[in-house]
Amino acid sequence: MVWEKEKIVGSCIVGGAAFAVGASFLHLFLKGELPLGLGLGLSCPWRILRKRKPVRVYMDGCFDMMHYGHCNALRQARALGDQLVVGVVSDEEIIANKGPPVTPLHERMTMVKAVKWVDEVISDAPYAITEDFMKKLFDEYQIDYIIHGDDPCVLPDGTDAYALAKKAGRYKQIKRTEGVSSTDIVGRMLLCVRERSISDTHSRSSLQRQFSHGHSSPKFEDGASSAGTRVSHFLPTSRRIVQFSNGKGPGPDARIIYIDGAFDLFHAGHVEILRRARELGDFLLVGIHNDQTVSAKRGAHRPIMNLHERSLSVLACRYVDEVIIGAPWEVSRDTITTFDISLVVHGTVAESDDFRKEEDNPYSVPISMGIFQVLDSPLDITTSTIIRRIVANHEAYQKRNAKKEASEKKYYEQKSFVSGD
């Protein structure tokens, strides 16, 4: 008699030896209909193998100006369980506890949902874990552990936002990603709009144009603050890139879609155009221009984030399969052949209209080959949009950053090693 290979559902111990059994065997045994000889001496306790309940972990945050540090935190949190549920704090809660957010809730939701390690998202999460909300997490969302980084999260009254979770024994800690924070990124932009640099010759609209299009930056008066520096403190490692990568290439007959750009201050507009691009094929390859190219095309103040920072932000997006770190400005025939590109795409919303030019068009080769397509951008957001928000409300952000810079300085002075990656 031939027994077909099937899913193992139980185990039995006979004569000191353990046997795994399938559904058909178990069914026949329970009915007493096993073939002659197979049932002899099989009087044993059955242990039905039940599917293990997945470990569900919860992490919340503002996720304002979402960057690769946020993504790395979510990656680490996901590694502590089987399913990651993320709470995104409401605009009202952020204003009450930290000051005005740069990106509204719907944009922050788009960003968090696009992170490849996120399984579920809760909108309008509270800034602090209350008794009621913690009970809701445990009962309704079946959360096993609440996760946060090793940097302190303190409420306006000085108390720990995660005190209740710690007291309940359901709290786990991850390592904060070094070298980046939303405060740091906003600070890089505020470098050009410090109060002392605003004069009759540097109106708000003038500053917006300078920052967005790369004119000479206003000079600081002696003693002016330069805390918000464009210099990144991020130290890239090959291990981090591997952690963010999918680790697999396209199949032999895959339709490969290519899209390129700076992807500076990675935002919801980027996410949505990448989603649209990915829908056109089997594998999405993203070319990320190097810092020199971005500066030459966008102006001296760009990019805000360096090449490695921008690459990690793009790699964390669930719609992206692979990136070219330091892609050429012009899409050449060699690039198309090397990566077996089927279609080159570009969104209608962009920092420049070079893709519409007849001369010096970086996409002239794919256009001539008939493999270039312009996609309607779902959102009218660019990096300049984010910068304009900062400039328009720079006084509020300077005040917010002053508080955060002080707390971050204290964190770095008092921090200790936390295991993890």
Swiss-Prot record:
It is a single-pass membrane protein. It is found in: Mitochondrion outer membrane. Keywords: Lipid biosynthesis, Lipid metabolism, Membrane, Mitochondrion, Mitochondrion outer membrane, Nucleotidyltransferase, Phospholipid biosynthesis, Phospholipid metabolism, Phosphoprotein, Transferase, Transmembrane, Transmembrane helix. Changing residue 126 to S: In pect1-4; delayed embryo maturation and reduced fertility. The keyword Nucleotidyltransferase applies. InterPro entries: CCT, Cyt_trans-like, Ect1/PCYT2, Rossmann-like_a/b/a_fold. Its EC number is 2.7.7.14. Residues 203-227, 402-421 are annotated as: Disordered. Residues 403-413 have a biased composition (Basic and acidic residues). GO terms for molecular function: ethanolamine-phosphate cytidylyltransferase activity. The modification Phosphoserine is found at residue 416. One of its GO terms (cellular component) is mitochondrion. This is Ethanolamine-phosphate cytidylyltransferase. It comes from Arabidopsis thaliana. The lineage of its organism: Eukaryota, Viridiplantae, Streptophyta, Embryophyta, Tracheophyta. The gene is PECT1.
